[in-house]
């Protein structure tokens, strides 16, 4: 087929991607051809399973492969064969890109308990409308670009908000971005190179996993626990092959909803210092946490921590305004990278967010939102427990519950069946650094009040029980 060269400067992941894409492009591998399984290819070529997983996932994302549950990987029909593809032919392709595409399509599935945002009537809509009216009534230039680091008054306000969390910094240490995903992308492109070992929560944010794979990173999952982390595993992974960065979400972790204890956070900082690792802290749900909870940034004071957060979850995801804070030299580098990639961020959006934040009703809205989420957690968690689901933890805050049922072995199969009922679920394999099959599911509690979702789950559990009894 093709030969891998371990001494090459090109990563093994990229060699596999290049090898297969060439075979498909030249017609050696034709549409519909079945490919070696991940384990078969890894064994035949003497590489790790994770290397092949990364390569296959990139080939799926680039349109060369399609993954079919329980069947394996196949060469996807190319564009010239599109007229031969039956309607709905991609329904089996529930990979990272399918999830990212369908979850944001307004014309897609109408019930989305697997999504990652709040319903419109839970957001600060009135505050946004007041900010828009204020902005429209004043004088604002629509020529030129905004500040490279973002709208200065908003950066100053972020500085003050972080000071309330015991993080001491200057305005120059803050960079505004187009949401937290943009911030994660910038820091990843600054710190991660193809072939690098990168530590990441397991499970983790699906979009981050996908983005790091595209950079050619070797993802090393640090198992999350209800208390925080598998600390023994973390230290083991830090010893070999010596990763230099750890992307983590200590508070209201996505997808599990768990928050790390103070003892676990101190230990993570100790290990980062011992092994010279940069910690990228994703804290986008901090405004949803009703309990006083320190951040890694507050414990470290941005010496080794890069802090990322966003206003998308509580004000409006459509505005796409986030930020990062860190060591002055690193923030200057990231500001330069931001300019190279897309010039400045959207100052109009930043001004709207600023107007919403200085609105006297903002803090009351945030408090009401936290109370509403707590009430929803109690109700939805009880519902899942009544149905026989296991909860990873009961966070009683934030947006997510991470659940599994003893009758459901592979959540991906359930998610595929859910699409036939106009329901989009969040199956666990999408949040796995290695894309391993998983029985776990992420549920957004704010979208779980639709009885159709629970009716479907109950039917599937009963169906699985009948199949088990028949076997």
Which residues does each PLM region occupy?
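Glycine-centered flexible beta-alpha turn that most often forms the glycine-rich phosphate-binding loop
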Residues: 282
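Structural signature of PLP-dependent enzymes
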Residues: 334-341, 357-381
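Short beta-strand "wing" residues that participate in macromolecule-binding interfaces
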Residues: 66-68, 169, 425-426
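Conserved glycine-rich beta-strand-loop-beta hairpin in the small C-terminal domain of fold type I
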Residues: 371-381, 391-404
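Conserved core of the PLP fold type I
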Residues: 141-275, 287-300, 462, 466-470
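Conserved PLP cofactor-binding pocket of PLP-dependent enzymes
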Residues: 420-442
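N-terminal basic, amphipathic alpha-helical segments
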Residues: 1-133, 335, 339-345, 375, ...
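Active-site PLP attachment segment
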Residues: 70, 300-333, 348
